[in-house]
């Protein structure tokens, strides 16, 4: 996942720069993006092409940028509603695979040949976003030390299980603009990370690591020619000797 880290840092820098430029152009503070649908729409218009380009260049199933602002602070549920873009690959990971808009302005998406997802909504719901408040806590660590992998969760409105590779969006002055990163779906991981091993049965996990591997919060795959059993408990790491764990 070194590529994800590099591309994630590039994505964060690109998206933060777009926000910085738009705020400077309009002489606004970031807080003034709330209740400014015209400005938020202009930002999405500028962000969608570089976001789609990064998605096509990266081994993942989706890419997103979430801004900590909403088009209407007076609507019901506005405290959890956030603007941004979330784009997914609609099929096999090929250079020309069509892209779908899961979150963001439908008009902006259509103008760039990104059609709305069947579960499209205009804005993110942060109460359905894993540990949103935690990831939005300002930090000073450089971007290459600031990425993280969420636990597996069900993408709202779908039956797809995903993990998100997250990075912060920070302004030149350190203001937290939001989050960005990449999606790795369960189906994508199974298809693209099955191992060409000589074993009949092999389990591969993408899991948050701590004292052990939280298998119940992980994505899993097997071998290209066999089958596997996906564990659902926390796995404890033990040395087997000879440099093996």
Spell out what each predicted region is:
Residues 75-77, 159, 217:
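A short acidic (Asp/Glu
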């Amino acid at each position: 996942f070194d590529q994800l880290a590099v591309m994630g840092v590039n994505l964060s820098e690109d998206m933060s720069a777009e926000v910085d430029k738009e705020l400077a152009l309009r002489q606004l503070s970031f807080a003034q993006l709330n209740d400014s649908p015209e400005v938020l729409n202009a930002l999405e218009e500028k962000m969608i092409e570089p976001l789609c380009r990064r998605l096509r260049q990266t081994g993942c199933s989706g890419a997103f940028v979430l801004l900590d602002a909403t088009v209407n602070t007076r609507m019901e549920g506005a405290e959890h509603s956030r603007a941004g873009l979330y784009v997914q690959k609609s099929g096999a990971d090929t250079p020309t695979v069509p892209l779908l808009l899961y979150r963001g302005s439908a008009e902006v998406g259509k103008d760039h040949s990104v059609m709305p997802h069947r579960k499209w909504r205009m804005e993110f719901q942060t109460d359905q976003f894993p540990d949103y408040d935690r990831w939005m806590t300002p930090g000073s660590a450089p971007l290459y030390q600031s990425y993280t992998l969420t636990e597996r969760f069900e993408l709202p409105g779908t039956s797809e299980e995903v993990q998100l590779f997250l990075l912060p969006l920070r302004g030149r002055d350190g203001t937290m603009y939001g989050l960005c990163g990449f999606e790795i779906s369960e189906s994508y991981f199974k298809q693209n990370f099955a191992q060409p091993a000589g074993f009949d049965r092999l389990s591969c996990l993408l899991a948050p690591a701590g004292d052990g591997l939280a298998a119940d919060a992980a994505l899993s795959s097997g071998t290209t020619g066999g089958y596997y059993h996906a564990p659902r408990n926390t796995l404890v790491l033990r040395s087997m000797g000879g440099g093996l764990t």
